[in-house]
């Protein structure tokens, strides 16, 4: 009995022992493209706006989905390449929280937007976050090919989420999407408050 307890304690210590933490760019050891893919799914300040954008596109129908699906990754990649080339991030720290707040509110409101408005939102989101990613990759001394991984992951995620939302026919399902938007807006408001209070660093 004592041996099992000691073995369990040893396993628990091994599993719970803190390792080194990296705040932003993740290295998987599989190359820069996979690092970019993992970056998107591990950075909620990039992941949640993409999900919110896909929810908005899905709520506004197939035409808006198709336009946003191609506009968002292309704008993200182009702005990321420009940010990588410049190496300077001129945007303030609270931009991610503002985009979360705005996109969350638009999702929760469920107002019918023209496909051109959804496309403009996707382009603005791609430019702002793409620039920030490109500048961050350059500042960390990583390869720019990580932007390709981020872009591919954005395309796949946006396609899956927006297609799911477009396929929803029941009124209660749209309410679930709106509730998700309200949670995203709440997270954005929380992050904005945190950033403005100076505790984000």
Q: Predicted regions span which residues?
A:
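Membrane metalloprotein/metal-transporter helix-bundle signature
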Residues: 2-201
């Amino acid at each position: 009995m004592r041996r099992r307890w000691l073995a369990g304690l040893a396993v628990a210590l091994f599993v719970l022992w803190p390792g080194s933490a990296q705040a932003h760019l993740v290295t998987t050891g599989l190359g820069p493209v996979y690092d970019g893919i993992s970056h998107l799914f591990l950075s909620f300040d990039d992941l949640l706006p993409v999900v919110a954008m896909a929810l908005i596109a899905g709520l506004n129908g197939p035409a808006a989905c198709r336009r946003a699906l191609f506009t968002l990754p292309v704008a993200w990649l182009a702005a990321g390449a420009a940010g990588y080339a410049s190496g300077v991030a001129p945007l303030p720290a609270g931009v991610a929280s503002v985009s979360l707040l705005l996109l969350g509110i638009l999702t929760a409101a469920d107002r019918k937007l023209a496909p051109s408005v959804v496309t403009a939102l996707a382009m603005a989101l791609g430019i702002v976050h793409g620039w920030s990613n490109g500048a961050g990759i350059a500042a960390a001394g990583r390869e720019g090919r990580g932007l390709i991984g981020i872009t591919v992951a954005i395309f796949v995620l946006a396609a899956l989420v927006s297609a799911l939302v477009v396929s929803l026919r029941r009124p209660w399902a749209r309410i679930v999407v709106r509730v998700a938007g309200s949670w995203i807006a709440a997270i954005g408001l929380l992050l904005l408050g945190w950033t403005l209070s100076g505790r984000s660093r």
